[in-house]
């Protein structure tokens, strides 16, 4: 999957989605690998967005400084690989970009949930879903019949929220 997603044309498409829908906004991006996260952050930064990558190899002090700078508005975009899936609280996040697939509903809801925190003056959070997870899981705020899901039946209705040109088509595995 990394070989498909971590290519310049794909990263350009990710960037164009953010530029089109969330230019100048504060957000968090979920990448599939350390290299993918670093390439996204580098590309975004080269094109005028203040972005940094944080991953398991980022030294603790540097990670802490990046998070503080993000919370204070000195960094616009955090690109990460499973670092901020849960337990990260920054209510003024304005967009979440899904640049990686997952088969886990729990992971999807946790990651998108980083942007769903209430914040003074915040009316909404944009979900930029470049990998089409909404097709599998529905909107993160959808009412869910959890019992039906546990029994193996999908209960969520799917509502498209990104245009076709913004979605990266992944090859069949």
Annotate each language-model stretch with its function:
Residues 47-50, 91-95, 121-126:
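Short glycine-/polar-rich loops that comprise or flank the Walker A/P-loop
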